[in-house]
UniProtKB/Swiss-Prot annotation:
Record key words, sorted: Hydrolase, Manganese
Superkingdom per UniProt: Bacteria
This protein's record includes keyword Hydrolase: yes
Full protein name: Adenine deaminase
Cofactor(s) the protein requires to work: Mn(2+)
This enzyme's EC code(s): 3.5.4.2
Residues of the signal peptide: none
GO molecular function: adenine deaminase activity
Catalytic activities: adenine + H2O + H(+) = hypoxanthine + NH4(+)
Family: Belongs to the metallo-dependent hydrolases superfamily. Adenine deaminase family.
Length: 574
């Protein structure tokens, strides 16, 4: 659209394509609510005011409140287990019209091919999808990934997709920043000199180390767990993305840090949410509603989901309902209940009565093959000989990705260390599924599995094959079924398959519609009850490999002391 086309519409000399009348417009600039009309032309807002009376199409909002299209500041589409187009279909009815996606999950499996698949498969759909190019593929040198993304790859991608790539993805390797790792610093320098944002990931970082991290032009963080952590990072110039995902939920802990003076430096993100969680709790709209219910002023909550994020990422025509801005508008009943009535995207009604009323298909349909599919070592054993020492155990906690390290006496049978169901300590193994280079074995506490096993090819960030279980027989059977699926999730009991979900796209995403995935995932979660689990542990299992979030994790190379960034032995020296 040309400027000379829209100016006559704003002046009333040319009829708008769409006139929306009787609107209670939430103005994120003034913080006020205005009873007015909105004139739309092509994909833009031409003007706002009572002077606009006619349009080629007229929509009577009947007093509904109009807010800007919602923005997710940081999300991994792959965590939904849906293809990008199916993810769009799922979140659009919840009012999200823009996301900043970090495709480092598929990048760790497929490299550049995976990133290009995500970019191309989101072209031409009614969702603004921008990308933060992954900064760490692999995330650390303590795991085996399916690909490596170097500085030259980044230059090529940014030059090829200059308007789609708007940031460097979360810099998880903060020890690499502090050690001035040449490759990582080069990537940061390349992106910042192309005027892209540098997104952060620095759980618990404080003091001089935080200063040094920010010196590397890192300007955001979504890993804050406490009010104090958020306020320190904010005081040093960081944009705080308040995360409310499936496994990691930080909203309640961080809202006390938000006030009338500083709220412009807070945004909302989901990071990682599975589709069932989105259906049950909504998307960014659900976070806004929870914030309002917790006492946050509705205007402030809306700003945190719109204009704050747009300004941080320099999305200059998004995040507000204003002349010249994109015509992405969400209509809700009121500012308390926050029920979405319809959604306009690019001047077209795309959602009405919670249903998408237009085709949501990308311009490409080619799905990349998984590299090597599920390629693990042929001869392996899950047995662990006792060494007459205490063992390290990963301890998971609900509502956080942080883990603890337990030092305990092992449960020994016939000279081998085995699971201890009474103490909720079970065996875990991680296999390199990309190059069949090896595997490691450990123990995890807090999953509550009583009898059976769970195996999955989702394992942040290199996404190697993880299997947890109470006995080796079920674990071995789960591994065999995962190989047959060529990736996915399986639940096994007494060497019988209880439930499964096939994820053929890189072992991370389904090629089926979101309704199918939601139903299969529901069956999968219900099946966990049969092995003794009363809560959803899948997302917790999926993060047990993440060697950049403290304290103790496990990769295909062994147990990882995250704070020291080194491999540690299962058995503890006394």
């Amino acid at each position: 659209m040309k400027i000379y086309e829209i100016v006559p519409v704003a002046l009333g000399k040319k009829m708008p394509d769409v006139l929306i009348k009787n609107v209670n417009l939430v103005n994120v600039f003034t913080g006020k609510i205005e009873k007015t009309n909105i004139a739309l032309y092509k994909k833009r807002i031409a003007g706002i005011g009572d002077d606009y009376k006619v349009g080629k199409e007229v929509i009577d909002a009947k007093g509904l409140f109009a807010i800007p299209g919602l923005i997710d500041a940081h999300v991994h589409i792959e965590s939904s287990m849906l293809s990008p187009t199916e993810f769009a279909k799922l979140i659009l009815p919840f009012g999200t019209t823009t996301i900043i996606a970090d495709p480092h999950e598929i990048a760790n499996v497929l490299g550049v091919e995976g990133i290009e698949y995500m970019i191309k498969s989101t072209e031409g759909i009614p969702l603004n999808v921008y990308f933060a190019i992954p900064s760490a593929v692999p995330a650390t040198n303590l795991e085996t990934s399916g690909a490596t993304l170097g500085a030259e790859d980044m230059v090529s991608l940014v030059e090829k997709y200059p308007f789609r790539i708007i940031a460097l993805g979360e810099v998880m390797n903060y020890p690499g920043v502090l050690d001035c790792d040449r490759d990582l610093i080069t990537k940061i320098e390349i992106l910042r000199h192309k005027y892209k944002k540098i997104d952060g990931h620095a759980p618990g970082l404080t003091g001089k180390e935080l200063n040094a991290y920010i010196d590397a032009f890192v300007r955001s963080d979504h890993e804050c767990e406490t009010k104090e952590e958020a306020l320190e990072k904010l005081s040093k110039g960081m944009q705080i993305f308040i995360r409310e995902g499936t496994a990691a939920r930080n909203l309640n802990a961080l809202l006390p840090a938000v006030n009338e003076m500083n709220h412009f430096f807070f945004s909302f993100c989901t990071d990682d949410r599975d589709p069932n969680d989105i259906i049950e709790r909504g998307h960014i709209n659900g976070i806004i509603k929870s914030a309002i219910d917790s006492g946050i002023d509705p205007i402030i909550a809306i700003r945190m989901a719109t204009i704050n994020t747009a300004k941080y990422f320099n999305l200059r025509s998004m995040g507000a309902i204003s002349p010249g801005y994109k015509a992405d508008i969400v209509f809700i009943d009121n500012l308390k209940d926050f029920n979405i009535k319809f959604v306009i995207k690019d001047s077209k009604i795309v959602v009405e009565d919670k249903r998408i009323n237009m085709n949501v298909e990308s311009i490409i349909r080619n799905i990349p093959n998984t590299l090597g599919k599920i390629n693990i070592v042929k001869n392996y054993s899950l047995s662990i000989k006792n060494r007459n020492r205490k063992i390290r155990v990963i301890s998971v906690k609900s509502g956080t990705l942080l883990t603890d390290e337990l030092i305990v006496e092992p449960n020994v049978e016939k000279g081998y260390v085995v699971s201890d169901i009474d103490r909720d300590i079970i065996k875990i193994a991680v296999f390199d599924r990309h190059k069949a280079s090896g595997y490691s074995i450990g123990f995890v506490h807090g999953l509550s599995i009583k009898n059976g096993a769970v195996a999955t090819t989702i394992g942040h960030d290199s996404h190697n094959l993880t299997v947890v279980g109470t006995n080796d027989e079920d674990m071995n059977y789960a591994i065999s079924r995962i190989k047959e699926l060529n990736g996915g999730i399986v639940v096994v009991k007494n060497k019988k398959l209880i439930a499964s979900l096939s994820l053929p796209i890189a072992g991370l995403m389904s090629d089926k519609n979101y309704g199918f995935v939601v139903e299969e995932l529901r069956k999968l979660k219900n099946s966990l009850v049969e092995i003794g689990v009363n809560s959803d542990i899948l997302m917790q299992i999926h993060f047990l490999q993440l060697a950049v979030i403290p304290k103790l994790k496990i990769t295909d190379k062994g147990l990882i002391d995250v704070e020291k960034q080194k491999i540690v032995d299962l058995f503890v020296e006394v």
